[in-house]
Regions:
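C-terminal amphipathic "assembly/sorting" segment characterized by alternating charged
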Residues: 198-274, 284, 295, 304-311, ...
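C-terminal accessory segments
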Residues: 156, 226, 230-260, 270, ...
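Acidic glycine-/aspartate-rich tracts in secreted/extracellular proteins
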Residues: 301-302, 321-324, 512, 536-539
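Acidic Gly/Asp/Thr-rich repetitive segments characteristic of extracellular carbohydrate-active
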Residues: 267-305, 567, 572-584
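Short coil/turn segments at beta-strand junctions that form active-site/ligand-binding loops
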Residues: 112, 190, 292-294, 313
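Extracellular polysaccharide-degrading/modifying enzymes targeting complex plant/algal/animal polysaccharides
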Residues: 8-14, 30-31, 158, 244-266, ...
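Beta-solenoid repeat scaffold
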Residues: 295, 304-332, 340-352, 382-384, ...
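Glycine- and acidic/polar-rich repeat regions and solenoidal domains
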Residues: 1-234, 331-340, 355-381, 388-548, ...
Length: 585
């Protein structure tokens, strides 16, 4: 939380605070609830009047969670603010009689950029301009919520007596009525008016999405310009002119302290200085002394390390020759990771073998690549063409995100994981079931997994919190051979992904005692499992019936050279024709 108006004392009520001409700068996705940029009140003070005015502020890329400005009290005014590329909304979350007017929302098509979300009664929303917002559902340009019957104050009270007029929506993906409808939220909005609004979007056939009954909404005198003529009560197709937006200088004028440059900084490109390293060199010292953006090139050979290679800056570590992978082996006296990513770390690692075999008289490596504890900054990780082998303890993993750490993106491709007792890829440390998760964007592509006792892929986002949009998970063209056949085991354990694609994967003699895929998803989450092959493998277990799409296959795989761990399908085989399993590199 950046700024809170606290109302926990009678003297705090009807405060008539003014929050104006401030600059709220970039805030990255947090991966959990509690990352609002501004909040006025709490659910316990929802029906108390704050009378706070929030005006003439600039919010730029404030994307901590879905609620950029969270209103949880009554009789507030939010006006003349600009939200620029914020992945979130102004949320009238609790409280009545709030006013949102003359604000400018600019998304520039950025994912999850949103506008205004409406809960509770008596609000007025007018003269706002919303342009290029790409968010859906809770991140919509306009989301008018369904409510919970007989709701507790901290849940969802019915939208009643809300007036929305003279707003302009240009190239916004989603205007939605009945947002959040499910088995709990079943009360549609009532006594709501949507009048004199303009909607321009040549990519849409209809102006809004009705998630629930809209009988309680009066549509009147709205003008639309869509992909084709649209005629419905309250809407007419007319040629309308999009509003002229202010230029960048005008948006930033008089926002923030006079001495502060109120613009998201674009860091200068790092100089990619190269460091050529031979076996026998102390890798930890090379990494410590390397400049940010440096490229550490390892010659063929074995690199024993006694403690973790500590990555707290942008670095690339790669093999000098991809065909002759350097081998990193742990021989420390105390268990440690081979690589630890810390605050400031952005790592690319290519064509390296991590061998977890136990050295006589030495400790085991806890992980090939993992993170420090309690990181503040998000990190990024790209692992390409690497091998992870011989990690012999069940609690020690090849790649792992630890609790209280968060990755903006993790990309793992063209890798081999073999002979592991623990998980291969584990981003499942946040098990408090409050919506936290360890990585926002994950891509796992063209990887092989052979002879694993643990889970090849384990990703967890527990609970029912709806303040975030991730994780976004894509798993494609992977092959799993002799993996996790124990009772109640899973090849993939995917709990709570909000956007998921699993496609073109091959399961060979895997998950027999449990499942190939164990997916726990909500009805509204965008999940898709398609074009996979299951040979002598377990079933797919999902919470809803919507995840598995299209045909699944049951062909005996034939590989180019399984003895050398090359699980690419033989040319001309059924899997190769169907583009299932590994792609040729």
């Amino acid at each position: 939380m950046t700024l809170i108006v606290i109302l926990n004392d009678e003297r705090c009520l009807e405060n008539h605070h003014r929050i104006d001409h401030n600059y709220f700068g970039e805030r990255p996705v947090y991966g959990s609830n509690g990352a609002e940029t501004m909040r006025v009140g709490t659910s316990q003070q929802a029906y108390s009047s704050s009378n706070t005015v929030i005006e003439n502020n600039l919010f730029e890329r404030c994307s901590g969670e879905v609620e950029v400005i969270s209103i949880k009290s009554s009789d507030n005014i939010i006006r003349n603010n600009t939200l620029l590329e914020c992945e979130g909304v102004v949320a009238l979350r609790h409280g009545d009689r709030n006013t949102v007017n003359d604000n400018l929302f600019i998304g520039n098509g950025r994912r999850n950029t949103g506008g205004i979300r409406v809960v509770n009664a008596g609000h007025q929303i007018y003269d706002n301009v919303l342009v290029g917002l790409a968010g859906t559902r809770f991140f919509s340009a306009l989301g008018v919520m369904d409510a919970v019957p007989n709701s507790l104050p901290n849940r969802y009270c019915q939208v009643v007596d809300v007036k929305m007029y003279r707003n302009t929506f240009v190239d916004c993906t989603n205007i939605e009525f009945g947002t959040g409808k499910d088995m709990e939220r079943t009360l549609a909005p009532e006594k709501v008016s949507f009048t004199d609004n303009i909607i321009i979007n040549k990519g849409l056939d209809q102006p809004y999405i009705a998630v629930d009954d809209v009988a309680g909404i009066q549509f009147k005198d709205n003008k639309v310009q869509l992909a084709k003529n649209y005629s419905a009560p309250g809407f007419t197709t007319e040629k309308v002119k999009a509003p002229q937006l202010p230029d960048d200088a005008a948006i930033r004028k008089d926002k923030g302290a006079s001495w502060f440059k109120n613009q998201v900084a674009h860091p200068a490109a790092n100089v990619h200085k190269e460091y050529n390293v031979s076996p026998g060199t102390n890798l930890s010292e090379v990494i410590h002394s390397a400049e940010p953006g440096g490229v550490i090139i390892l010659a063929k050979g074995t690199y024993p390390i006694q403690r973790a290679m500590f990555i707290d800056k942008p670095l690339t570590i790669r093999a000098a020759d991809a065909a002759n992978k350097p081998l990193v082996r742990f021989n420390g006296d105390k268990p440690d990771n081979m690589v630890t990513i810390a605050d400031g770390g952005k790592m690319v690692i290519e064509n390296i073998t991590f061998d977890g075999v136990l050295e006589p008289g030495k400790a085991l490596a806890k992980a090939g690549i993992s993170t420090a504890f309690d990181m503040i900054q998000p990190y990024t990780l790209i692992v390409d063409g690497c091998e992870f082998q011989n990690f012999g303890e069940g609690g020690f993993f090849a790649i792992k995100g630890t609790k209280a750490t968060f990755a903006e993106s993790v990309t793992i491709r063209n890798c081999l994981f073999r002979d592991l007792s623990g998980d291969a890829i584990n981003y499942a440390a946040e098990k408090d079931d409050i919506g936290r998760y360890n990585a926002d964007d994950m891509l796992i592509e063209n990887c092989s997994f052979y002879r694993l006792l643990g889970l090849p892929i384990n990703i967890y986002r527990g609970g029912s919190d709806e303040s975030t949009a991730g994780p976004y998970i894509t798993i494609r063209h992977c092959t799993f051979v002799d993996c996790c056949n124990k009772e109640r085991g899973s090849v993939m354990r995917l709990i709570g992904p909000q956007v998921l694609t699993v496609e073109n994967c091959n399961f060979d003699n895997s998950g027999r005692g449990g499942a190939t895929i164990r997916l726990d998803e909500a009805t509204w989450e965008k999940v898709r499992i398609a074009n996979c092959n299951l040979w002598n493998s377990g079933r797919m277990m999902t919470t809803t019936s919507q995840a598995i799409q299209g045909k699944m296959y049951n062909f005996r795989p034939a590989y180019i050279n399984a003895e050398a761990y090359d699980y690419t399908p033989v040319e001309g085989s059924e899997l190769e024709k169907l583009s299932i399993g590994l792609k040729k590199k």
